[in-house]
């Protein structure tokens, strides 16, 4: 019996998980998404071509990989169908859990309306309706992908839901779709998606029993976890390694190696605590060189220095076996590079994450920069200062680096 290896982001998302998964996919039979929705975005570059994935597992770019969208994901049929249109021959290579919850148009309308009502206290969601979809799930009023197999029955259930919440929708100025319009959409979803809907948990159990190689692909980042992130400025699902298991119906004994994906600096989209944010020239330089624009939202990412306190925290949360250090090349040409080694908090120096992270100040150490690592594929060819930087990050995080990315391209990766 084999075990499932896990890839997780360990900052605030956008760490470069897509490139790592894409690089590793050739060694796996199954690649699986476990949580989130189309608020998450993976960018993968292959031979100069950019692929932006939101719901599809990154294994879709490898013809021999079977791709699974697990029960923990909230699925927008509209978005998924549009994404599927980019690819050919998906039958037999893509499966969607019948237990995954649906993310429908009214969810995004609720999301946007509620954010507007919050004004300056808005969380900064993507507006994709992910929170409202998970809220329906937790309230036990949601609808699942398997219900698409009976579109007439699902339509009737949704109309009843809309009528029961009519006052709420009117307050948010959301127009309720007609039964005819809704049924037409559901029938279209049914026609296209039915061949892909199945019990993916049983499929994965069988795969592991048959010693197939399985890779679980986390979405977003550990500092956005609903329980362990910078609440309330978090996502609506578990983004740590344990969450990937529940989001696919696997047990803890079925977990294999766990790799944490981390940028050589730090970024964050939306509001919330971000201790190492640099609002000056260096932060702007990182944003420009790193092309730090959100894949799902098009919003500019906030940029700053590597936060070793946060990474050490998430390394323990996830039980990491190794790190994959991404976008090291973005720091090419910086004379000095900062690392946050600790925080100042209520007059004390601390090395942990308090629940009120917005009240800390970073304590930095500086290291000398380097000229260029872009495109290097051999560790021995890295500049000495880059090697020292990597070694210091390993020391502070308490986890060894196994992969180093030196450009957006799939093959520009150092394996240690």
Swiss-Prot record:
Binding site for Mg(2+): 14, 41
Binding site for substrate: 295-301
Active site: 14, 42
Bound cofactor: record note: Binds 1 Mg(2+) ion per subunit.
Gene Ontology molecular function: adenylosuccinate synthase activity; GTP binding; magnesium ion binding
Top-rank EC class of the record's enzyme: ligase
Pathway: Purine metabolism; AMP biosynthesis via de novo pathway; AMP from IMP: step 1/2
Keyword Lipid metabolism: no
Cofactor(s) listed in the protein's UniProt record: Mg(2+)
A single BP term in Gene Ontology: 'de novo' AMP biosynthetic process
Entry EC number(s): 6.3.4.4
Keyword annotations: Cytoplasm, GTP-binding, Ligase, Magnesium, Metal-binding, Nucleotide-binding, Purine biosynthesis
GO cellular component terms, A-Z: cytoplasm
Binding-site positions, IMP: 14-17, 39-42, 126, 140, 220, 235, 299
Binding-site positions, GTP: 13-19, 41-43, 301, 327-329, 405-407
InterPro entries (UniProt xref): Adenylosuccin_syn_GTP-bd (IPR018220), Adenylosuccin_syn_Lys_AS (IPR033128), Adenylosuccinate_synth_dom1 (IPR042109), Adenylosuccinate_synth_dom2 (IPR042110), Adenylosuccinate_synth_dom3 (IPR042111), Adenylosuccinate_synthetase (IPR001114), P-loop_NTPase (IPR027417)
Listed HAMAP family: Adenylosucc_synth
Similarity remark: Belongs to the adenylosuccinate synthetase family.
Functional description taken from the UniProt entry: Plays an important role in the de novo pathway of purine nucleotide biosynthesis. Catalyzes the first committed step in the biosynthesis of AMP from IMP.
Entry protein name: Adenylosuccinate synthetase
Organism lineage string: Bacteria, Pseudomonadati, Campylobacterota, Epsilonproteobacteria, Campylobacterales
Gene name, Swiss-Prot/TrEMBL: purA
């Amino acid at each position: 019996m084999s075990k499932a290896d896990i890839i997780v982001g360990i900052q605030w998302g956008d760490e470069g998980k897509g490139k790592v998964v894409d690089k590793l996919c050739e060694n796996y039979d199954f690649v699986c998404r476990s949580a989130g929705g189309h608020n998450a975005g993976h960018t993968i570059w292959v031979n100069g071509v950019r692929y932006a994935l939101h719901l599809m597992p990154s294994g879709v770019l490898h013809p021999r990989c079977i791709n699974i969208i697990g029960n923990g994901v909230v699925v927008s049929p509209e978005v998924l169908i549009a994404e599927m249109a980019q690819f050919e021959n998906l039958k037999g290579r893509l499966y969607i859990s019948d237990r995954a919850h649906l993310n429908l148009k009214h969810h995004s309308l609720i999301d946007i309306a509620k954010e507007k009502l919050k004004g300056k206290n808005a969380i900064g969601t993507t507006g994709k309706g992910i929170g409202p979809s998970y809220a329906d799930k937790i309230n036990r009023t949601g609808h699942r992908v398997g219900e698409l197999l009976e579109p007439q029955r699902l339509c009737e259930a949704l109309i009843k839901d809309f009528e029961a919440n009519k006052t709420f929708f009117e307050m948010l100025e959301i127009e309720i779709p007609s039964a005819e319009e809704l049924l037409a959409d559901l029938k279209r979803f049914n026609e296209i998606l039915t061949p892909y809907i199945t019990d993916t948990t049983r499929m994965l159990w069988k795969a592991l029993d048959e010693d197939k190689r399985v890779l679980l692909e986390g979405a977003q980042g550990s500092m956005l976890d609903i329980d362990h992130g910078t609440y309330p400025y978090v996502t609506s699902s578990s983004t740590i390694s344990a969450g990937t298991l529940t989001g696919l119906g696997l047990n803890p004994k079925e977990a294999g190696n766990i790799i944490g994906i981390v940028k050589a600096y730090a970024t964050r989209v939306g509001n919330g605590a971000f201790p190492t944010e640099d609002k000056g020239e260096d932060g702007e330089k990182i944003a420009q060189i790193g092309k730090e624009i959100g894949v799902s939202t098009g919003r500019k990412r906030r940029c700053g220095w590597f936060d070793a306190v946060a990474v050490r925290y998430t390394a323990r949360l996830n039980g990491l076996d190794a790190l994959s250090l991404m976008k090291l090349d973005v720091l090419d040409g910086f004379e000095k590079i900062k690392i946050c080694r600790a925080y100042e908090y209520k007059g004390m120096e601390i090395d942990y994450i308090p629940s009120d992270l917005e009240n800390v100040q970073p304590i930095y150490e500086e290291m000398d920069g380097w000229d260029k690592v872009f495109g290097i594929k051999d560790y021995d060819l890295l500049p000495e200062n880059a090697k020292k930087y990597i070694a210091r990050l390993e020391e502070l995080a308490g986890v060894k680096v196994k992969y180093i990315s030196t450009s957006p391209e799939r093959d520009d990766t150092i394996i240690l």
